[in-house]
Amino acid sequence: MYQLAIFDLDGTLLDTLADLRQGLNYALSTQGFAPRTLPEVRAFVGNGIRKLIELAVPAGTDEAQIEAVFEAFNPYYAVHCADFTTPYPGISELLRQLQADGVVSAVVSNKPDYAVKTLSAQYFPGLLAASAGAKDGVRKKPCPDAVFEVVRQLGAEALRAVYIGDSEVDVATARNAGLPCISVSWGFRDRDVLVNAGAETICDSMDALYRALREG
């Protein structure tokens, strides 16, 4: 069984899409830009908030306006990041079972670090040994920097670790970190995207994910 399970957050542990859309559309509105739909936001997420905004603004938007949208997003989202966000059904129970089995669980996300810390504490108190989000000086996924940071923080270099996520970014992150990857199909990417990214293990349910973790 794996000893350290490092999870992505958005689309893996939490369904955050509605709050991301709300925050994005608020920020876009400050510059007079049209709102984006839920399917559009679903397609844009995965590479951090700045990339989300770059994809969401109209083509040809200058850098100053992109920066203004980014600056509007963060204070709004800091207050509203949990308005509609919910854990995926069964995920809290899974984390509790892993804890009972002696597995250490952690989170590495491209979401802003303030939001990762807030949401992890609110929805999974006592269940995550460490969490790391996007912050200055640490390259975002698929670079493995934050994964290595969490492993060092936990003193877990000797543990058998696995990375779990819902996107092609997560598959690449695991590969770059030299870790096996378990992909989940209930998140923000369709199965064919995961397959095309090289996903080898794709779980469609919490039971399947638990089995994959036990077999690792």
Predicted regions and their residues:
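Active-site neighborhood of HAD-like aspartate-dependent phosphohydrolases
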Residues: 1-43
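Asp-based, Mg2+/Mn2+-dependent phosphohydrolase catalytic module
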Residues: 1-3, 39, 99, 113, ...
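Generic enzyme active-site microenvironment
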Residues: 6-8, 108, 164
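Conserved hydrophobic/aromatic "anchor" residues
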Residues: 7-9, 73, 147
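An amphipathic alpha-helix signature
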Residues: 21, 25, 38, 42, ...
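Helix-loop "lid/cap" segments that line or gate small-molecule binding pockets
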Residues: 27-28, 48-62, 119, 150-151
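Metal-dependent phosphoesterase signature
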Residues: 54-93, 101
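Short, acidic loop-to-helix structural element flanking the phosphoryl-transfer center
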Residues: 79-107, 113-121, 144
